[in-house]
Amino acid sequence: VKFTSEKDISLLELVKAKMGFVSNTKARNVIKIGQIMVSGKVIKIPSTLIKPGTEVELARRVKSKRVLKEEPILKHKILFEDENILAVDKRTGLIVKSSNGNLRTLFTDVNYYLKGKGVDTCLMVNKVDKKESGIVVFAKELSIYKELSDNWKKYTKRHYIVIPGGMVDEKGNLADTFHENDIGLLLPGKGKKTMEVSLDYRVMKSNGQFTVIRIEEISSHKNQIRAMFSLLKNPILGDDKYRSEYKYEKGMAAHFFSIKFPYNDYELEIKTPIPKPFLKLAR
């Protein structure tokens, strides 16, 4: 992929416009990992000024020179891996990514693992909160990253949660209007950032005191599941941000267990079982 600029413009703005990225963050990530070449040289500074007529291109994926003699080991459960994608099961309590380069994160672990296999590109497609667990997908190719991240909201995503008490019905749909406040909390009703939230649910196991619920996202908004169950006066165990009165020793009883999307002419589903601690609570 090659393109040129018609005017003075930052590399970030040019890459975002020419490659169709929907956010600055995604375009910035691509530049910082060395996927963009300017006049034949890799440039990793998003603010670099590009003059009219300067040739910019997508760098070809190359094998890393640093290949471990022994097969690298990733200390996270690998759910799926091929030449383009790696999906792992993140444990509760681990940060997925940080600007602090000295901090161990899921990203640093996966990046080291991939470099050990000779893969230089490591792009994280989705995030899972530190207090939660579940599937995190990484792309080994820029084109795959862009395809997955641009369409993420359209894909079928399912979660397991544990709430105190139970539900009136064994299955159904939960729908309501929320708005995002100035500190990122979703609150009931309309506001500056209004959104419609819709979730399908099914009770998987319950003992009256605690209930394991499977959630399928119909809408796709950050923290929508947490906000919905807070509205129902049954916030997820350990979710102090949304007023849970119950502690959960591992963090929060929320697990992203399934993602399904079109891939290589078939429907790929990456999934995990119900976490054993969830079942133990509701037995």
Predicted segments with their positions:
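RNA pseudouridine synthases
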Residues: 1-283
